[in-house]
Amino acid sequence: MSNEREMQNKKDQQLESFRVEDEGKKLTTNQGLKVSEDEFSLKAGERGPTLMEDFHFREKMTHFDHERIPERIVHARGFAAHGEFQVYDSMKEFTKAKFLQDPSVKTPVFVRFSTVAGSKGSAETVRDARGFATKFYTEEGNYDLVGNNIPVFFIQDAIKFPDLVHALKPEPHNEIPQAQSAHDTFWDFIANNQESAHMVMWAMSDRSIPRSFRMMEGFGVHTFRFVNEEGKAHFVKFHWKPVLGIHSLVWDEAQKIAGKDPDFHRRDLWESIENGDYPEYELGVQLISEEDEFNFDFDVLDPTKIWPEEEVPVKIIGKMTLNRNVDNVFAETEQVAFHPGHVVPGIDFTNDPLLQGRLFSYTDTQLIRLGGPNFHELPINRPVCPFHNNQRDGYGRQTINKGQVSYHKNSLAANTPQPASEEEGGYAHYQEKVEGRKVRKRSESFKDHFSQAKLFWNSMSEVEKNHIIEAFSFELGKVQSKSVQQQVVEMFAHVTSDLAKPVAEAIGANLPQSEGSSVTKSSLALSQENTIKKPDTRKVGVIIDNGFNGDEVKQVLNELQSKGIQAEFISDKLGIKKCAGGSEIEIDHTFLTGESVLFDALYVVGGKEVDPSFKDDAVYFIKEAYAHFKPIGATHVGIKWLEEQEIVEKEGVVTGTDMNIFSQNLTGAVMEHRHWNR
């Protein structure tokens, strides 16, 4: 679908000039010379030595030897898509950013989702924060909102970032473990850098094992500024709210998917867009006037703190739709360069010390990863508006600048290109008053590390709290150092003993004495139990064999599909299965290739005469789906299999002989996502 579309926006039109279709063409060298042979190198005789004059071999091999570029130090494993953003109403009251003014304007975007810790080839369903980086191609230049799916971070000052990443990455003496935080150095860092407490609570929650990129929130993490035409500023935090709601995997399921389909999240995103089920996210902002900066019990500049939505409501201002897959992952997803310093008039920075460090680091890392200062000229990074300056030369330069002048000020070119006034669209930094002594120290207002960690805990449902306890128990159970284990338990005892004590018992640590923070506040916005629940794009595995009731299956599938639910057929063999009346269904997966963990729900149909091995495989699927709290529907022989497992009357298990009622009940069960009360 994505390769057979009309040009959708200015960015798509720009990229079209760089796209190349090789199918049906003659093979050439990079110099355009047609090649007559591509299977054998040039040799002196059939069994003789290869000749150095074989320019085609040398070009082909040299290019191959240099195909790889350094992967990102963090966020190496990522996948991306194109789309568009549209503001709902003008935000003129708060910002002069043009792309936030006109509801009729669609701004092209490019969004890259990623894990943080793992290498480029690591699994996607690991426990980890997820990157959520958006590049807006606006008429005023590129604006990058470089965020995560968690609204806070581990550290407050960017100078600690190398230490955090060194601790999180595989341990250097043996390069183990990959894409995991369950090891000694990470938890040693956490215990000795207790500002991380709030972020760790999020990381140990279900937020760090999302069901899909389409079902996770995004956050700008930092505090930025909106500045309007009059020069008035507001502190702002950015939120992406998924239209499908916020949903997660369970931990056992996530680990199994990592082995069964390490590309699970990118496959889900790719297939959704190819099927026309375009992911949608609403953009929300929290706004605090500068006059109210000190009216809260948190510092608005602290990146380890949220602004609770009950205190600072999220104003929904627009929607982003991802509607086109990339044409080439390397050229687009791998070579895209995000940078929080890519801003437009009306959006400015604050003194968040983590943000300030990122403003240096992102440009610096692109220089080595993309080979020099001209990464902005790569097709995916080019703005859709013209750019003119006196930057010249360097590796990979593509622009051919005409004229003799490449400096400012000048008279030979009438002092052009010349700076634009603020009225002409020139970027003017917000005139913040700054004063103080040069010091290396933490603000007193940054020193409360546990209150919001307790707020997060208070906001969780009992199920979510149990998942956090289990996650801590798993992670610390992998830690070899008893000292580190004990330090972490004592650290989180300052949050709540309701967490620290069961974790201590699980790993054999001494029970902590602290009862934890006295904070009693909670926030409904933090629990996934309060999220939107929709059946759209859920995937149901239909276990089926020859002799099934064709009319009943058709009726059920029609109901599921009318609600946007997708069905895929699973059996013992690929090929065709026939119903009792003769109609046919083509099988999508065998029991070997389609695991229950790859589906949101099961619909167990069976068949007229099922052999024992088919039943054994079907029952395995049923048991695993049930253990992962997934909806299960069954008819006919499927009901018997559920009865044998004594789960027919359990929540989220749907049976029946009236197909109208059965179909509606199964749809409702699928919409709930998980059924925890069983």
From Swiss-Prot:
<dbReference type="Pfam" id="PF18011">
    <property type="entry name" value="Catalase_C"/>
</dbReference>
<dbReference type="InterPro" id="IPR041399">
    <property type="entry name" value="Catalase_large_C"/>
</dbReference>
<dbReference type="InterPro" id="IPR011614">
    <property type="entry name" value="Catalase_core"/>
</dbReference>
<dbReference type="GO" id="GO:0046872">
    <property type="term" value="F:metal ion binding"/>
</dbReference>
<protein>
    <recommendedName>
        <fullName>Catalase</fullName>
        <ecNumber>1.11.1.6</ecNumber>
    </recommendedName>
</protein>
<keyword id="KW-0349">Heme</keyword>
<feature type="binding site" description="axial binding residue">
    <location>
        <position position="362"/>
    </location>
    <ligand>
        <name>heme</name>
    </ligand>
</feature>
<dbReference type="GO" id="GO:0042744">
    <property type="term" value="P:hydrogen peroxide catabolic process"/>
</dbReference>
<dbReference type="InterPro" id="IPR018028">
    <property type="entry name" value="Catalase"/>
</dbReference>
<feature type="compositionally biased region" description="Basic and acidic residues">
    <location>
        <begin position="1"/>
        <end position="26"/>
    </location>
</feature>
<dbReference type="InterPro" id="IPR024708">
    <property type="entry name" value="Catalase_AS"/>
</dbReference>
<dbReference type="GO" id="GO:0006979">
    <property type="term" value="P:response to oxidative stress"/>
</dbReference>
<keyword id="KW-0575">Peroxidase</keyword>
<dbReference type="InterPro" id="IPR043156">
    <property type="entry name" value="Catalase_clade2_helical"/>
</dbReference>
<dbReference type="Pfam" id="PF06628">
    <property type="entry name" value="Catalase-rel"/>
</dbReference>
<feature type="region of interest" description="Disordered">
    <location>
        <begin position="1"/>
        <end position="32"/>
    </location>
</feature>
<dbReference type="InterPro" id="IPR024712">
    <property type="entry name" value="Catalase_clade2"/>
</dbReference>
<dbReference type="GO" id="GO:0005829">
    <property type="term" value="C:cytosol"/>
</dbReference>
<keyword id="KW-0376">Hydrogen peroxide</keyword>
<dbReference type="InterPro" id="IPR029062">
    <property type="entry name" value="Class_I_gatase-like"/>
</dbReference>
<dbReference type="GO" id="GO:0004096">
    <property type="term" value="F:catalase activity"/>
</dbReference>
<feature type="active site">
    <location>
        <position position="75"/>
    </location>
</feature>
<dbReference type="GO" id="GO:0020037">
    <property type="term" value="F:heme binding"/>
</dbReference>
<keyword id="KW-0479">Metal-binding</keyword>
<dbReference type="InterPro" id="IPR010582">
    <property type="entry name" value="Catalase_immune_responsive"/>
</dbReference>
<feature type="active site">
    <location>
        <position position="148"/>
    </location>
</feature>
<dbReference type="Pfam" id="PF00199">
    <property type="entry name" value="Catalase"/>
</dbReference>
<dbReference type="InterPro" id="IPR002226">
    <property type="entry name" value="Catalase_haem_BS"/>
</dbReference>
<dbReference type="InterPro" id="IPR020835">
    <property type="entry name" value="Catalase_sf"/>
</dbReference>
<keyword id="KW-0963">Cytoplasm</keyword>
<keyword id="KW-0560">Oxidoreductase</keyword>
<comment type="function">
    <text>Decomposes hydrogen peroxide into water and oxygen; serves to protect cells from the toxic effects of hydrogen peroxide.</text>
</comment>
<comment type="similarity">
    <text>Belongs to the catalase family. HPII subfamily.</text>
</comment>
<keyword id="KW-0408">Iron</keyword>
